[in-house]
């Protein structure tokens, strides 16, 4: 595999959100190793140490992949403050790769060993270090974290200025970028909760607090959104696996040692050593996590440090931080009993009694605040969900303004508005507005929302979006509005991406007849084909689409000059449909075999490989075999691929020819007349594993046919025996049946073909 191809498929310059220089250097080495990895596997070490070396390299490569993915999918703010730990992970990956490559170098051939040596030299010369500008940004954000822990923090204007400067330097300069950053932070919080890492959760919660607090800075920005109609791959959550280990944790601790004012503490700042007893949870404030100086009771019955709970209330909370219970009042009652218990515990354990309230607020505060906010949003979501889209107040759309402007205005509302409320608002607006023009603007907003938000697809599907969009598409067809048809089709496409439930709803709601109506409009072919591709991935949809007008339509696209993406989608859709055996007669009757003939020898690999994959599905049907044998140039094209194709294509072609030649001796004669023996011998030595096996089987088949043909030719054709009694002759070997005579004639031709091919001294019978 080519290095550039591996790199293009996995990591491209600019993918990394931060630490791009380190990522690019490591990804180049990763791609070089991956390009020769098949050769390493092909070495097939027999010794235990060799197998362990290869397995070790595979594990290290997975860790490298996870590190690069972490830098491309994680939060920019989080990457900035954990720069030191990221550098440590890169250094550890470098060390592990070096060790693994040295072990593998001993078990491979010299030619591959020289390539490994070059990679090792490049790896050893690679230095990983933080970019000074990125380190400065990280220090700025850490400074904000320190200020966020103070009860008497600096003014919001100063905080705003510092955060805006840091965010701008990180590229968070638009509403779109701010939304992406908030989503990344939420995913980090979810992972921290799964790992029960309260420190990490608290720090990320405060970063999310800052993002929410200052997202209004970006709300006036206009972003550009280009939809990819044929893309079904969506952003996935960051995967931080074994590469984040104990060493990373220690580096993270060192990085945050500067934040000692808000690290988790078991007692006050004057604690003696790490060996002293940990205070009972009942004596520590749930917010500051320290021994309480002035414990007070709130309406829920929980006890807190006075200064901490007062800040909680002053920030607008009217719930208990620990139980999330709505408080009937915000009065504070001193808890003298707990204060006495604290004094007693300190005396017994030799710990100094707190002599004042904490000077700073632990970041645990922000974790609790986020938890309360999420529980409130959940209750709001349940209330909105239970109302079933009724009695919801919606802001009507204005008559003027472009789709892009309105999408920007509604896409980024206040952070307090939940996703459920947004989905509900859009669906209700779509139902309430009366003109197709207004509906079109709403559907465009829905399309943008669904494009890269899996949760939105789920919520929209559960709340009637499928039916609403199909109704809109029907109206667009009735009014012959091409642009509305395209917008509606792409909204349905986005709704169906990676969501089988929504696909099932579309089928049940009658999407196929609407798509068949759209086939009359050439401008809609691209969006219609994209939906067919999306639906064809669903098993339940294959028989429905296979028996519709979609099959002749998509087969016709393979013949005609149309958009490349449209033709690609059609070919992939037909491949999915061909995996369902009852569809094969319909595909054959649509003349699919002839349509694929020219694509099998296309200059572009994507056409050849997928066309051969479709043919491999069709050849499993008896009628499919007959159709292929009778196709004018298909067998010739397959033989050409044996000589000029890529290894995977050669494997597919030889598999097809093996099945066809086993099915028909006529096909065997056609294949041999193409002079394929040298190509088959080459594949049997240098092809893929399956390609080698099938090339050998095909050569064996030809050898058996040749031997049978030679035996037949050497047998006496006619033997006369004279009877002594009556003196007449009897033809003991006479053959009178028509069918065997035809076979004999065919074998004579085969014999001539074989005798011609085996005259070459370069290829003996034993080579076949």
Curated annotation (Swiss-Prot):
The keyword Repeat applies. InterPro entries: ARM-like (IPR011989), ARM-type_fold (IPR016024), Armadillo (IPR000225), RING-Ubox_PUB (IPR045210), Ubox_domain (IPR003613), Znf_RING/FYVE/PHD (IPR013083). Pathway: Protein modification; protein ubiquitination. It catalyses: S-ubiquitinyl-[E2 ubiquitin-conjugating enzyme]-L-cysteine + [acceptor protein]-L-lysine = [E2 ubiquitin-conjugating enzyme]-L-cysteine + N(6)-ubiquitinyl-[acceptor protein]-L-lysine. ARM repeats lie at residues 454-497, 500-540, 542-579, 581-620, 623-662. Keywords: Repeat, Transferase, Ubl conjugation pathway. One of its GO terms (molecular function) is ubiquitin-protein transferase activity. The keyword Repeat applies. Binds to SD129. Functions as an E3 ubiquitin ligase. PANTHER family: U BOX DOMAIN-CONTAINING, U-BOX DOMAIN-CONTAINING PROTEIN 45. This is U-box domain-containing protein 45. The gene is PUB45.
């Amino acid at each position: 595999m080519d290095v550039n191809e591996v790199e293009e498929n996995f990591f491209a310059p600019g993918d990394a959100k931060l630490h791009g220089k380190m990522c690019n250097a490591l990804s180049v080495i990763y791609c070089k190793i991956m390009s020769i990895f098949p050769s390493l596997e092909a070495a097939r070490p027999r010794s235990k140490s060799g197998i362990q070396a290869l397995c070790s390299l595979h594990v290290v490569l997975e860790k490298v992949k996870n590190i690069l993915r972490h830098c491309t999918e994680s939060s920019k703010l989080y990457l900035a403050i954990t720069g030191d730990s990221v550098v440590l992970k890169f250094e550890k990956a470098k060390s592990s790769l070096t060790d693994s490559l040295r072990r593998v170098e001993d078990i491979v051939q010299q030619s591959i060993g020289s390539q490994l040596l070059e990679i090792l030299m490049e790896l050893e010369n690679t230095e990983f270090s933080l970019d000074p500008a990125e380190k400065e940004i990280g220090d700025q954000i850490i400074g904000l974290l320190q200020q966020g822990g103070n009860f008497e923090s600096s003014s919001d204007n100063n905080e705003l200025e510092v955060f805006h400067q840091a965010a701008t330097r990180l590229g968070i300069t638009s509403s779109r970028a701010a939304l992406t950053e908030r989503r990344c932070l939420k995913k980090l919080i979810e992972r921290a909760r799964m790992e029960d890492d309260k420190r990490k959760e608290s720090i990320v919660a405060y970063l999310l607090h800052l993002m929410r607090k200052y997202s209004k800075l970006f709300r006036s920005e206009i972003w550009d959104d280009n939809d990819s109609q044929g893309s079904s791959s969506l952003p996935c959550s960051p995967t931080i696996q074994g590469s984040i280990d104990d060493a990373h944790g220690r580096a993270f601790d060192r990085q945050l040692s500067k934040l000692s004012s808000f690290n988790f503490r078991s007692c006050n700042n004057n604690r003696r050593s790490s060996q002293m007893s940990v205070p009972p949870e009942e004596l520590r404030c749930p917010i500051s996590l320290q021994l309480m100086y002035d414990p007070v009771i709130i309406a829920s019955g929980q006890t807190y440090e006075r200064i901490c709970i007062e800040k909680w209330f002053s920030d607008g909370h009217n719930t208990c931080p620990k139980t999330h219970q709505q408080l009937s009042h915000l009065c504070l009652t001193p808890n003298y009993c707990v204060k006495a218990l604290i004094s007693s515990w300190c005396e017994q354990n030799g710990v100094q009694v707190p002599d004042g309230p904490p000077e700073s607020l632990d970041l645990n505060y922000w974790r609790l605040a986020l938890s309360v906010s999420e529980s409130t949003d959940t209750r709001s979501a349940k209330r909105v969900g239970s109302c079933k889209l009724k009695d919801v107040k919606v802001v009507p759309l204005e008559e003027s303004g472009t789709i892009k402007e309105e999408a920007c205005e509604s896409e980024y509302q206040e952070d307090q508005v939940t996703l459920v409320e947004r989905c509900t608002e859009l669906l209700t607006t779509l139902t309430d507005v009366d003109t197709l023009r207004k509906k079109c603007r709403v559907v465009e907003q829905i399309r943008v929302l669904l494009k890269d938000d899996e949760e939105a697809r789920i919520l929209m599907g559960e709340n009637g979006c499928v039916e609403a969009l199909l109704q809109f598409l029907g109206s667009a067809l009735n009014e012959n509005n091409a642009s509305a048809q395209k917008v509606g089709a792409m909204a349905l496409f986005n709704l169906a991406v990676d969501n089988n439930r929504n696909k099932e709803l579309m089928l049940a709601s009658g999407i196929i007849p609407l798509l068949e109506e759209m086939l009359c409009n050439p401008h809609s072919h691209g969006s219609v084909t994209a939906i067919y591709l999306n639906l064809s991935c669903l098993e339940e949809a294959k028989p429905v689409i296979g028996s519709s007008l979609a099959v002749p339509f998509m087969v016709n696209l393979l013949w005609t000059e149309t958009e490349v993406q449209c033709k690609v989608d059609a070919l992939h859709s037909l491949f999915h449909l061909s995996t369902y055996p009852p569809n094969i007669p319909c595909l054959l009757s649509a003349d699919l075999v002839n349509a694929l003939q020219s694509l099998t020898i296309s200059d572009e690999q994507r056409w050849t490989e997928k066309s051969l994959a479709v043919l491999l599905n069709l050849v499993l049907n008896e009628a499919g075999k007959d159709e292929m044998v009778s196709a004018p140039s298909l067998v010739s094209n397959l033989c050409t691929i044996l000589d000029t194709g890529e290894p995977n294509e050669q494997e597919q072609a030889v598999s097809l020819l093996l099945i066809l030649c086993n099915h028909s001796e006529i096909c065997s004669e056609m294949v041999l007349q193409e002079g394929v023996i040298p190509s088959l011998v080459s594949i049997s030595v240098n092809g893929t594993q399956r390609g080698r096996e099938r090339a050998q089987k095909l050569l064996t088949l030809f050898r058996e046919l040749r031997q049978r043909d030679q035996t037949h030719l050497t047998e006496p054709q006619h033997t006369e025996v004279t009877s002594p009694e009556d003196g007449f002759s009897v033809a003991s070997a006479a053959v009178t049946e028509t069918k065997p005579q035809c076979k004999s004639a065919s074998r004579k031709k085969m014999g001539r073909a074989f005798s011609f091919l085996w005259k070459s001294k370069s290829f003996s019978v034993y080579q076949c």
